[in-house]
Amino acid sequence: MSWIERIKSNITPTRKASIPEGVWTKCDSCGQVLYRAELERNLEVCPKCDHHMRMTARNRLHSLLDEGSLVELGSELEPKDELKFRDSKKYKDRLASAQKETGEKDALVVMKGTLYGMPVVAAAFEFAFMGGSMGSVVGARFVRAVEQAQEDNCPLICFSASGGARMQEALMSLMQMAKTSAALAKMQERGLPYISVLTDPTMGGVSASFAMLGDLNIAEPKALIGFAGPRVIEQTVREKLPPRFQRSEFLIEKGAIDMIVRRPEMRLKLASILAKLMNLPAPNPEAPREGVVVPPVPDQEPEA
């Protein structure tokens, strides 16, 4: 037996450790590899650079409202391809694909519940559903949210994350801008607070309607907010845009929004503002945070 064969015979192969898919993810901004459970615990905010990643509509609502208080509204409403629209793909096929990918019927989820014990109605966009585009179902669900807030005599909160009106529904989509704005006008007559939270991105017909009609317009850090996108504007005016143009920090300097709030601080900030507006006792900041349930972070992180 040669010396090479003797060495090979004494080698014991080790089993390669397998890491379940989805345990690790990467920050979109700084590129840092992050432990998925830790990121979820931090509400999809990078602990290294504070970049606010996109959050699903349901996780956002569960992180906001008191655990056990959530009741979904308008879940029976489903989109229809009334125009038999087709571009490079049939609209009904795009809907089916988005529904399968996200598990949602459309791009807006509405729930009622309590926030630190205070009754509220909250809506959140699912950006992964066709870019959070606004069609007839989104408009109908938003109006349902407004009507429920009036019925319960409570505030309304909406988290926007949308590319704008849904082109596949043409005029029916554009009509939702007027429909939602008219519904909010009735709510304003009742003197009920409506707080709009602008997240990345809030663009097009959504930013031109109910997203900017809040009694208070709050934005998350570095959120892209506007009508047309920066690239489209640059190509139209043939000029270089200012740094941070259309970002929330730029907008607050120009007086277009009221405040910027980090996501981990959003729940208490909203509750404090609404308590003042509704003449209710201030929320207890020491109360345990309820909401989205994430797996506990192990004592030791798995090896990358």
From Swiss-Prot:
Residue ranges of the region described as Disordered: 284-304
Any Gene Ontology CC annotation: acetate CoA-transferase complex
Zinc fingers classed as C4-type: ranges: 27-49
Taxon lineage: Bacteria, Pseudomonadati, Pseudomonadota, Gammaproteobacteria, Enterobacterales
Localization annotation: Cytoplasm
Domain CoA carboxyltransferase N-terminal: from-to ranges: 23-292
Catalysis performed (reactions): N(6)-carboxybiotinyl-L-lysyl-[protein] + acetyl-CoA = N(6)-biotinyl-L-lysyl-[protein] + malonyl-CoA
List of residues binding Zn(2+): 27, 30, 46, 49
UniProt KW keywords: ATP-binding, Cytoplasm, Fatty acid biosynthesis, Fatty acid metabolism, Lipid biosynthesis, Lipid metabolism, Metal-binding, Nucleotide-binding, Transferase, Zinc, Zinc-finger
Requisite cofactors: Zn(2+)
Protein's UniProt name: Acetyl-coenzyme A carboxylase carboxyl transferase subunit beta
Similarity section: Belongs to the AccD/PCCB family.
The protein's Enzyme Commission number: 2.1.3.15
Cofactor note: Binds 1 zinc ion per subunit.
SUPFAM superfamilies the record matches: ClpP/crotonase
Oligomeric form and interacting partners: Acetyl-CoA carboxylase is a heterohexamer composed of biotin carboxyl carrier protein (AccB), biotin carboxylase (AccC) and two subunits each of ACCase subunit alpha (AccA) and ACCase subunit beta (AccD).
